[in-house]
Amino acid sequence: MASQEATSQATPQKIVVASLNPVKTGAVLEGFTRMFPGGAYQVSGVSVPSDVPDQPLSDQETLQGALNRIKNARSLEPDADFWVGVEGGVNPEGEAFQSFAWIAVESKEGRTGKARTATYYVAQETANLIGGGMELGHADDLIFGKTNSKQHSGSVGILTDDVVTRTSYYIQAVILALIPFKNTQLTFSSNKSG
C-alpha cells in the first residue's frame, strides 16, 4: 500500500485510492487539499480490480470501472473516511477514439460524487492499436517510445508536451467529484452509486 500525506494539526482523514498508480494518488491528494484547504489527509493506494476490461470502451463501462474500484477498495480497506476510484477509458467514434476518465468518490456515510475529465482524441496511430485490442497506455508506449507512460504524464501529457499532465488532468475532475461533499446541505443525483 503506497501512502502520501498532507498534514495540519487535525487528525488526518483516511482516503483510499483504488490504485497504486502514483499519478492517481497524487491527483486525489491535490484535489482534496484544494477543495478542503487546511484539512489533513492520509492518502493510500490499494491494488483492486475494476471488474471491467483493462481498456474500457465506453463512457458507461469506464464509470462502472471507477465505481467497482470503490466497492473493491472498501471491501479491502473498510476503515477509511473516503474511497476514490479513477478509471480511464476511451469511446469509439468511427475509427477515432476519445480519451477521458471517470473519478468517483464515496464517503463512509455513503455519499457519492462523480465527475468526468475533459475529453480529447488520441492519435490515429494509437487508435489503430486500441481498435486491435491494446490498452491506451501500452499503445502510447509503443507509438511514442515510452515506458510505463501511464504512471507518468500519460497520453494527455505526451500529446500536449506536458502542458496538461495526467496528474493535472485528473485533479480538476477530483475537485468536481467532491462538489457533493463541499455542499452537504444540497442533494445531488450522483449521491447514489451505480
Please report, for each region that a protein language model flagged, where it lies by residue.
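N-terminal polybasic phosphate/anion-binding patch
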Residues: 2-80
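Anionic-ligand binding patches
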Residues: 54-194
